[in-house]
Each structure stands twice: as structure tokens, then as C-alpha cells.
Amino acid sequence: MCIRDRDDSKPKYINSPEDIVYSKGRHLFAFNIARKYNSKTIIMVEGYMDAVSLHQRGIHNAVASLGTALTEAQGRLLRRSCEKVIIGYDADGAGQAATLRGLEILQNLGCDIRILQIEGAKDPDEFVVKYGPERFQMYVNKAISLVEFKVKMLKKSLDLDNVNDKIKFLNEVISQLGLQNVE
């Protein structure tokens, strides 16, 4: 069970205690529905309300990771159940950091991963309410690869007018591509 703080204070979601019957790290919210639709692609969102909102608008392959901390057990569940995982976490700092952590887990499990980058809203719920499911699906179809996402995040964190940052950027990109570093 979970409740959501309506004033967007931190933490947004407050979960009931875990016990031998329920452990949120082993489950994905709405996973049973997504599986029923036999989708080869699952859109993983951060919050329960994101998943509920997407389902209400006909996007039945959305699941929520029950917070920002994707676990290895959740990753294995996804790996066994679909061909592609599209991460659509919130655009805030916590959501972006969680995206990076989740990417690492899913990459290590051998998942085909894409990252949803919506514009004009803070999360999938707000976006689909504001712009509709067709436009949301347009962004899903344009979800970017893991390498592309990491390169974009790296660009944001460095000053590419600075020579040292430029070298750091190139070395990191080369590392991501599995090549040798530049001197």
C-alpha cells in the first residue's frame, strides 16, 4: 500500500512497511495488466499515478517501479517479460539520477533499454493529461538509446568551451563506446 503527498513535498510516496508477504523491491505496479496485453515493450515510470494515468488513457504497457530505486529483482522481472524497456522517470533531479541507476541494472541484465524524454511536463502523468496519449506515444517512439542518453547527460554536466572538459567529454564518450582513451 502507498499514499502520495499531494503538495509535492519529499518524499512524494509513502509506502507501508515491508513484510514476508510484500516487498516492493520484488514487484512492479500494474505489471499484471501490462503482461495481459502481451506487450514486447514496457514503459517503466516512477510513480503509481503515472502508471494509472497512462492506463486510463489506453497505454496499457506502463508499469511503475514503486519509487525511484529500481532493484535487480525488478530488472530480472522485466528481462524475462519483454524485449524492450523504456524508462520514463520524472524529469527532476531524483528522476534523472534514478534513470542512470536503473539503466546500469538493466544494462547488466542484458535488456534493450531506451529513455523517454518528454518536454513540457514534469512527469508522464502530467504530460499525458496535458497533451494526450497520441503525443505521448510519439515521444515513446522517439525514445533514445542508453549511449545517447549518457552523452546528453555528460554534455549538460561539462563546459564544452573548456579544453579540459572537452577532453573529459571525449574520453567518456570513447569509454561508453568501448574504444581507447584520447591523450
Regions found by a protein language model. Give the residues of each.
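Phosphate-handling DNA/RNA-contact segment within nucleic-acid enzymes
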Residues: 4-85, 98-99
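Acidic, metal-coordinating catalytic cores used for nucleic-acid/nucleotide bond scission
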Residues: 49, 70, 89-99, 117, ...
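Flexible glycine/proline-rich, aromatic-decorated loop/lid segments
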Residues: 75-78, 104-106, 145
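Short, hinge-like loop/turn segments at secondary-structure boundaries
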Residues: 81-82, 103-105, 131-137
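Conserved acidic, small-residue-rich alpha-beta core segments centered on
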Residues: 86, 98-109
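C-terminal or mid-to-C-terminal helical accessory/interaction module adjacent to the motor/catalytic core
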Residues: 112-183
